[in-house]
């Protein structure tokens, strides 16, 4: 029987268990995927802890991103999908579909093909990161040549995707990381500037880099008290995206700074893209084209075998990585 990852109580990575499950047949609008690799995301850790946008229905599976081969399709699904190498797009609830396992059921609407030159591990590191960054930076902010964009948590897979998008559009990226030990690697990955926020004054550095104007776009997954500094670093009329809560602290609204600068501070998740068919089609085309011509390339931080799933999530939680943590599935 195929193995899947499941948890029966809330907690950290240690509550995850590898269990056997009877093979399932896909229903209407579904496919069965033989998984080759799975990309890990912080949203999944928040889900396991009961801190995500949706609460898990226990016992629950886990996982948004898998790459593999379609082995079977539902009664209303085009049979041409069978045999194709695909990866999954986070366009569903993990209470309905969970992608971390040897064999999974996925909605056909959440499948995306990836260029043949990518490995399954790289294919599992595409859609969450690039679609999250695309939706905010391109679809909403219309990032353009010469724009300054601040990218906190820049060593994450989404942060690296945002840096690559900025480079492709001719914008100037200001990556931030807590300490200076990741600076050289972030610069090598395309960041134009890197600020170590525990060692430097982010507001002063952004003002210096932008010639006193501030950044028009800020793409932040941290929130908490850090938002006040980001608002100070923003340009007049700038837009601040809050797409995460890594700090897990209360997030005071910087009212007077927002009023004085006319800032737009908005919450954002990639579901704004993935649950709208027209937006998703445009996003997939944008990402696929740039993967194909080499402007985008997933950065893999570390690969773990399926049996070490708990260790893989602990590594993700350590913040030691630069790029995507991936699990390979036998």
Per-region residue spans from a language model:
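NAD(P)H dinucleotide-binding glycine-rich loop of Rossmann-like/cofactor-binding domains
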Residues: 79, 88-153
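N-terminal Rossmann-like NAD(P) cofactor-binding module of classical short-chain dehydrogenase/reductase
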Residues: 87, 150, 218-219, 241
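Short amphipathic alpha-helix with an adjacent loop that forms part of the alpha/beta core around
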Residues: 201-212
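Glycine-rich phosphate-binding loop and adjacent beta-alpha segment
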Residues: 95-97, 177, 225-295, 328-330
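C-terminal capping/lid region of NAD(P)-dependent oxidoreductase domains
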Residues: 2, 295-302, 310-330
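Mid-domain Rossmann-like dinucleotide-binding core that forms the NAD(H)/NADP(H) cofactor-binding site
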Residues: 124-200
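Short glycine-centered segments of the SAM/dcSAM-binding site in methyltransferase folds
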Residues: 85, 148, 172, 238-239, ...
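Glycine-rich beta-strand-centered segment in the early N-terminal region that forms part
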Residues: 22-39, 51-92
């Amino acid at each position: 029987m195929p193995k899947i990852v499941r948890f029966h109580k809330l907690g950290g990575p240690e509550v995850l268990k590898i269990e056997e499950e009877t093979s399932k047949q896909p229903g209407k609008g579904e496919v069965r995927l033989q998984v080759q690799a799975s990309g890990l995301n912080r949203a999944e850790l928040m889900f396991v802890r009961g801190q995500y946008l949706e609460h898990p229905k226990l016992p629950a599976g886990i996982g948004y991103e898998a790459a593999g081969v379609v082995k079977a399709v539902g009664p209303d699904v085009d049979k041409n999908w069978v045999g194709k190498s695909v990866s999954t797009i986070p366009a569903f609830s993990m209470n309905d579909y969970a992608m971390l396992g040897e064999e999974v059921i996925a909605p056909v609407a959440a499948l995306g093909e990836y260029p043949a030159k990518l490995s399954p591990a790289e294919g599992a590191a595409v859609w969450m990161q690039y679609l999250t960054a695309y939706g905010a930076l391109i679809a909403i902010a219309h990032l353009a040549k010469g724009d300054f964009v601040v990218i906190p948590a820049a060593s994450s897979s989404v942060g690296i995707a945002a840096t690559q998008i900025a480079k492709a559009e001719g914008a100037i990226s200001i990556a931030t990381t807590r300490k200076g030990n990741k600076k050289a690697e972030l610069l090598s990955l395309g960041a134009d500037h890197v600020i170590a926020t525990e060692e430097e004054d982010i507001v002063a550095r952004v003002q210096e880099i932008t010639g006193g104007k501030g950044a028009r776009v800020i793409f932040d997954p941290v929130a908490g008290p850090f938002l006040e500094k980001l608002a100070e670093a923003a340009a007049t009329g700038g837009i601040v995206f809050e797409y995460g809560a890594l700090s897990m602290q209360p997030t005071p609204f910087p009212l007077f700074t927002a009023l004085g600068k006319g800032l737009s501070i908005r919450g954002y998740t990639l579901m704004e893209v993935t649950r709208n068919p027209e937006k998703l089609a445009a996003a997939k085309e944008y990402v696929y084209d740039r993967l194909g011509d080499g402007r985008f390339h997933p950065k893999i931080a570390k690969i773990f075998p399926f049996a070490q799933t708990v260790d893989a999530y602990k590594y993700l939680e350590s913040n030691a990585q630069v790029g995507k943590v991936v699990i390979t599935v036998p």
